[in-house]
């Protein structure tokens, strides 16, 4: 059984898709053991609680430095014996210290075809606004392993979709 930890910051639609995928058997032999939010009012925490998944809040402002925040996240995941970490709308950048114990064990979904519209500053609606402003005919999503360099980790898969006009 793969023990999954999910890091969230917002509404949790990606988290809900993962929960539903596990519940339906589409994602086999896996369980979400812990959901951590860096935002105390994230609706993703409600989604996790409704699914009987343990939650906790670890906010960046609780710590003197980003490195201390990274260590707290990693220690919490290690204590829960997490095998794989999924970023599901997690709006914080993880530093090198986080990856000491989780190298090649952290995955993210980016709302564009990396390397386009990726890297620092490209997240959420900003990505989609940039795609539209550039007049792109095609966009998509990328799943990649997370590294200390933003959106630079090895690609796992990509899916392209046409941009509809209007």
Sequence positions of predicted segments:
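N-terminal Rossmann-like dinucleotide-binding module
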Residues: 1-43
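A residue-level signal for conserved active-site and pocket-lining positions in enzyme catalytic cores
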Residues: 10, 35, 48, 85, ...
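A general structural signal for well-ordered alpha-helical segments in protein cores
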Residues: 15, 44-45, 70, 124, ...
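Amphipathic, non-transmembrane alpha-helical secondary structure
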Residues: 16-20, 46, 71-78
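Short, surface-exposed acidic-centric catalytic microdomains
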Residues: 29-68
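Glycine/small-residue-rich loop that forms an oxyanion/phosphate-binding "nest" at active or ligand-binding sites
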Residues: 61-82
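Donor/substrate-binding cores of folate-linked one-carbon enzymes
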Residues: 84, 88-166
